[in-house]
Design a protein with these regions (language model features):
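Acidic, proline/glycine-rich intrinsically disordered inter-domain spacer in sigma factors
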Residues: 2, 6-9, 81-111
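Helix-turn-helix DNA-binding module
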Residues: 3, 111, 115, 127-144
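Sigma70-family region 2
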Residues: 4, 32, 43-60, 78-80
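Short, small-hydrophobic-rich alpha-helical interface motif
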Residues: 22, 26, 37-48, 67, ...
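Arg/Lys-rich amphipathic alpha helix in sigma70-family domain 2
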Residues: 59, 66-88, 99
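DNA-recognition helix of helix-turn-helix
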Residues: 69, 138-162
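A short pre-motif secondary-structure segment
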Residues: 120-124
Length: 168
């Protein structure tokens, strides 16, 4: 299949419109620093570009989120395969558009959750996805999303009770 100029333009428009939102999600999925989140998004966008001719227009957002979740999972796995561990730094809090005064504390607490639990919480409560959409993005069952979300919120509430009463 021949790649068309229209497809390149469509992909560029999609990236311009959605990149910032994808970086916000990645910054919460891969706590450490904003540069790592941007690397995850770049990897995800590269995968999306390759698949672009096959992606239906009505599913492109879901496909992009799945690419980000998969790239974040790959990043997380690669940390354990390395001999040296880099010290984590907090992401640029302004880049994730906090809704609470204690956004740095929330980001720090999210970093303490296991990767799959963090992904479920971020996709459900930061991105506002449904259980089905989150399950699709994480490639797991809806029941797994529900339990991971509930356990994640439980851990966050225990560590940060004053600000978590309105979530969930």
């Amino acid at each position: 299949m021949r790649w068309s100029v229209d497809r390149d333009r469509e992909f560029t428009e999609f990236v311009m419109a959605r990149r910032a939102a994808l970086v916000r999600v990645a910054a919460l999925l891969v706590p450490g620093d904003l540069a790592r989140a941007e690397d995850v998004v770049q990897t995800a966008l590269t995968r999306l570009y390759v698949a672009w001719p096959r992606v239906r227009p009505d599913t492109v957002d879901a496909y992009a989120r799945r690419c980000v979740v998969n790239a974040a999972t790959d990043h997380h796995r690669s940390l354990f395969s390395r001999r040296e561990q880099v010290r984590a730094k907090l992401p640029d809090v302004a880049a994730i558009e906090p809704r609470h005064g204690d956004a740095a504390s929330i980001v720090t607490l999210l970093a303490t959750l296991p990767a799959s639990m963090r992904a479920a919480v971020v996709l459900r409560y930061v991105e506002g996805l449904s259980v089905a959409e989150t399950a699709h993005a994480m490639r797991c069952s809806e029941g797994n999303v529900k339990s991971q979300s509930a356990r994640g919120l439980e851990r966050l509430r225990a560590a940060f009770p004053a600000h978590m009463r309105t979530v969930g």
